[in-house]
């Protein structure tokens, strides 16, 4: 998730974006730590997965607010795949296909949405608890070059660490 976001931001804003982040001494924290620092006021703004905030709002009654930045958000898809039989220790394509079919069914998607994530079905009738409309997120999506994310990961990670990560 973090690497994909870094690649999307790099492609949209360029290396100067990371230099500017580093100059602001931003903190890099895990999701739960970032939320705790936001609630205590140690941080005034955090970049975090939507589902982390929605979960906290629903389960704990948190009053944390969240928004989509004017310049966009990065959508992180969750993939489902079936491994080729010759590459699989279990060689159970039928079970994999059954799981995939269930995940993509209305029932499977209802569990995804109950987990504070958005359905992959464009016509799914509900959003996660307190979530933004899926179309709104799609309309403001910052695209990720997934091939670049993989093939240039070492140099991009180094660029980010050199400019943003505090030593």
Model-predicted segments: where are they?
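Extracytoplasmic ligand-binding site segments that recognize negatively charged/polar headgroups
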Residues: 1-42, 75
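A bilobed periplasmic-binding-protein/Venus flytrap-type ligand-binding module shared by bacterial periplasmic
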Residues: 76-92, 111-112
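Short helix-loop capping/hinge motifs at secondary-structure junctions, enriched
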Residues: 10-17, 86-96
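Short beta-strand->loop
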Residues: 62-74, 84-86, 128-130
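Extracellular/periplasmic bilobal clamshell ligand-binding domains
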Residues: 129-167
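Periplasmic-binding protein-like
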Residues: 102-126
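A ligand-binding cleft/hinge motif common to bilobed small-molecule-binding domains
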Residues: 44-63
């Amino acid at each position: 998730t973090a690497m994909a976001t870094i690649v999307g931001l790099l492609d949209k804003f360029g290396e100067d974006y990371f230099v500017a982040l580093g100059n602001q001494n931003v903190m890099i924290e895990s999701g739960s730590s970032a939320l705790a620092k936001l609630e205590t006021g140690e941080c005034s703004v955090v970049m975090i997965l939507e589902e982390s905030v929605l979960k906290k709002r629903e389960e704990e009654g948190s009053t944390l607010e969240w928004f989509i930045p004017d310049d966009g958000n990065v959508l992180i898809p969750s993939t489902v795949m079936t491994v080729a039989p010759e590459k699989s220790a279990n060689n159970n394509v039928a079970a994999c296909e059954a799981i995939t079919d269930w995940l993509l069914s209305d029932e499977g998607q209802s569990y995804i949405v109950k987990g504070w994530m958005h359905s992959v079905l464009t016509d799914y009738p509900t959003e996660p608890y307190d979530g933004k409309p899926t179309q709104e997120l799609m309309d403001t999506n910052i695209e990720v070059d997934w091939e670049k994310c993989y093939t240039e990961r070492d140099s991009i990670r180094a660029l980010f660490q050199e400019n943003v990560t505090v030593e």
